[in-house]
C-alpha cells in the first residue's frame, strides 16, 4: 500500500517485496513523467585498487542486456518516443533516469527492470566502456587546465585513504587492471533491489505508479545475503 509522505508535495512511498523502495509523486500539471532509480553506491564505496568502478558501471549499464537489448539500444529506445535518458555518479550514489511522455512510462520502467536483472557484463562491454571512461578522463581532467585541481583538493582535505579522498572518475591503472570477475562482483554486490530507490514523478496517479513499479521492478529477484557495510571515514 502506498503511504503518503507529505500532503503538500503529494509524495507516496512503498517497499516492494524484493526490498526496493518506491516513491511516487503525482503531478497533474506535468505533460510527461520521469523515472529515476538511485543505487546506494558511489566512489566512496570503492576499495583500494578499484577506484573508478562506480563510474565505470554508470557506463556499463547502457551496454545492453542478456535478454536481448543491444548496446546503446536503451538510450535509442527512449529517444524514439521523444524522451531523454542519462545517469550520474557521485560519492554516495549512482542514479539513472528517463524523462518520457506519460504514455511511455511502462517502457521506461521495463528498460530499468531489464538492466537491473539482466545486465550484459561481458569482456567486450568491459573493454569498450573502460576505453570510454579513460577518454572521458583525458578530456575532462588530464587535458584541461587545472584538471587535477579536484584530485588535489580531495586528497588535501580528506587524505588518500579516506572514502572521499579520490574523484569519481577513478584511476586509469585500476581500470586497466580490472578483470571481468572484479566488475561482476561489484555489480552483484551493489546492484540489487534492496539497495535501490525508484522515484516516479509527473503525469501519473499514485496507485498506477505502484502497480507499474510492482509489475516491472518488483519482478527483479530478491538478493541473497546482507548488503556490505559501507566504507566509513573520519569526518
Regions found by a protein language model. Give the residues of each.
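M16/insulysin-pitrilysin zinc metalloprotease superfamily fold
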Residues: 63-67, 99-132
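N- or domain-start disorder-to-order transition segments that initiate the globular core
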Residues: 2-31
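Scaffold signal of the M16-like zinc-metallopeptidase fold and its non-catalytic homologs
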Residues: 64-65, 108, 140-193, 213-216
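Stable alpha-helical elements in mature extracytoplasmic
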Residues: 49, 53, 70, 74, ...
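An aromatic/glycine/proline-enriched structural segment found at the starts
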Residues: 2-3, 160, 164, 168, ...
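M16/MPP (pitrilysin/insulinase) zinc-metallopeptidase core fold and M16-derived inactive scaffolds
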Residues: 34-99, 165-169
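Acidic/histidine-enriched alpha-helical segments
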Residues: 79, 120-138, 205, 224-235
Amino acid at each position: 500500500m502506498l503511504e503518503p509522505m507529505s500532503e503538500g508535495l503529494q509524495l507516496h512511498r512503498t517497499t516492494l517485496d524484493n526490498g526496493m523502495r518506491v516513491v511516487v509523486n503525482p503531478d497533474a500539471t506535468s505533460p510527461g513523467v520521469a523515472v529515476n532509480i538511485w543505487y546506494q553506491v558511489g566512489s566512496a564505496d570503492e576499495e583500494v585498487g578499484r577506484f573508478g568502478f562506480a563510474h565505470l558501471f554508470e557506463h556499463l549499464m547502457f551496454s545492453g542486456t542478456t535478454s536481448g537489448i543491444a548496446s546503446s539500444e536503451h538510450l535509442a529506445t527512449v529517444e524514439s518516443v521523444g524522451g531523454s535518458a542519462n545517469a550520474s555518479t557521485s560519492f554516495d550514489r549512482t542514479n539513472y533516469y528517463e524523462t518520457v511522455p506519460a504514455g511511455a512510462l511502462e517502457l521506461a520502467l521495463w528498460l530499468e527492470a531489464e538492466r537491473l536483472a539482466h545486465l550484459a557484463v561481458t569482456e567486450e562491454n568491459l573493454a569498450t566502456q573502460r576505453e570510454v571512461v579513460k577518454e572521458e578522463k583525458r578530456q575532462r581532467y588530464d587535458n584541461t587546465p587545472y584538471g587535477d585541481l579536484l584530485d588535489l583538493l580531495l586528497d588535501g582535505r580528506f587524505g588518500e585513504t579516506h572514502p572521499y579522498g579520490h574523484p569519481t572518475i577513478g584511476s586509469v591503472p585500476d581500470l586497466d587492471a580490472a578483470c571481468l570477475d572484479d566488475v561482476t562482483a561489484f555489480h552483484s554486490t551493489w546492484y540489487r533491489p534492496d539497495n535501490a530507490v525508484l522515484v516516479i514523478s509527473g503525469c501519473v496517479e499514485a496507485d498506477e505508479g505502484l502497480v507499474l513499479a510492482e509489475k516491472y521492478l518488483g519482478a527483479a529477484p530478491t538478493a541473497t545475503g546482507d548488503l556490505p557495510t559501507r566504507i566509513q571515514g573520519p569526518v
